[in-house]
């Protein structure tokens, strides 16, 4: 479908949403709008739940476009009682963590693997269980990965910590700040995964709104691609922007960027975790 956008001052532009019909867009809007200002519902949960729903309604659409062009613009239009742009900045990162957990845990449970989104004090507790709290800043991991019958510091259910996820809606979120923590985690034999929606577009009048991301290509890599392919600063990177170019079969570091939908089935991310934690 074609989504028309009004930027004010007479500046109007449009963006094409592949594999999204007008009926599907309306279905997503009808679900999300009542959640945006729902009392006692955290914005991170509203956005996370709506993203999972949107990817179910439009399984062949680009997940990053659904986030960037559909949910973000609905939220900015509908949010009241606060600056909507600042509210989105504050909460959207945690919303992505919520969505990762909600989407993948039903699939990973079959393999004895569990994800837990970490908020506030939970981050420090997770790093303590990993044995790296004294060397890693308390905000440098977003989602904990656990394996039943393995890992460090098993809980009462037998789930031990085997790694963590650095979740980034956009790679403009100073991903380089996570690299020291990631290297420490990997040095301890823990997985340190970068998961991203790789959101990046440029608005008019100079941009065309196409959400191309920031990872470049294997032949023309950006600095951020080199964090993974060149320097091996993360165990792996998973992008949910279908315009992201995946890594070639061989990279200088042996680490790879994978590109995936968000359908809730076995995919590159689940296959990777199962293989690594077998």
Curated annotation (Swiss-Prot):
CDD domains according to UniProt: AgeI-like (cd22309)
EC numbers, comma separated: 3.1.21.4
GO BP terms, alphabetized: DNA restriction-modification system
Pfam families: RE_BsaWI
GO molecular function, one term: type II site-specific deoxyribonuclease activity
Alphabetic keyword roster: Endonuclease, Hydrolase, Nuclease, Restriction system
Reaction(s) catalysed (UniProt annotation): Endonucleolytic cleavage of DNA to give specific double-stranded fragments with terminal 5'-phosphates
Family of the protein in this entry: Belongs to the BsaWI type II restriction endonuclease family.
Name assigned to this protein: Type II restriction enzyme AgeI
């Amino acid at each position: 479908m074609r989504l028309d956008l009004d930027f004010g001052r007479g500046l109007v532009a449009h963006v094409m949403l592949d594999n999204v019909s007008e009926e599907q867009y309306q279905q997503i809007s009808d679900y999300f709008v009542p959640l945006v200002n729902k009392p006692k519902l955290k914005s991170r949960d509203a956005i996370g739940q709506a993203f999972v729903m949107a990817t179910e309604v439009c399984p062949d659409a680009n997940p990053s476009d659904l986030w960037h062009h559909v949910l973000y613009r609905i939220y900015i239009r509908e949010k009241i009682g606060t600056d909507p742009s600042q509210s989105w900045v504050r909460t959207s990162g945690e919303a992505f963590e919520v969505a990762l957990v909600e989407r993948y845990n039903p699939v990973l449970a079959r393999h004895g693997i569990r994800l837990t989104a970490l908020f506030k004090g939970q981050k420090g507790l997770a790093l303590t269980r990993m044995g790296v709290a004294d060397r890693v800043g308390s905000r440098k991991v977003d989602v904990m990965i656990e394996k039943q019958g393995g890992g460090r510091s098993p809980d009462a259910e037998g789930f031990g910590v085997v790694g963590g996820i650095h979740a980034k809606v956009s790679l403009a979120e100073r991903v380089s700040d996570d690299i020291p923590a990631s290297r420490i985690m990997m040095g301890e034999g823990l997985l340190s995964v970068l998961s991203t929606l790789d959101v990046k577009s440029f608005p008019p009048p100079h941009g065309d709104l196409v959400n191309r991301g920031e990872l470049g290509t294997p032949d023309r890599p950006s600095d951020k691609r080199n964090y993974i392919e060149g320097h091996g600063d993360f165990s792996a990177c998973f992008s949910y922007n279908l315009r992201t170019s995946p890594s070639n079969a061989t990279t200088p570091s042996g680490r790879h960027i994978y590109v995936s939908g968000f359908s809730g089935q076995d995919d590159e991310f689940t296959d990777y975790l199962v293989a690594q934690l077998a």
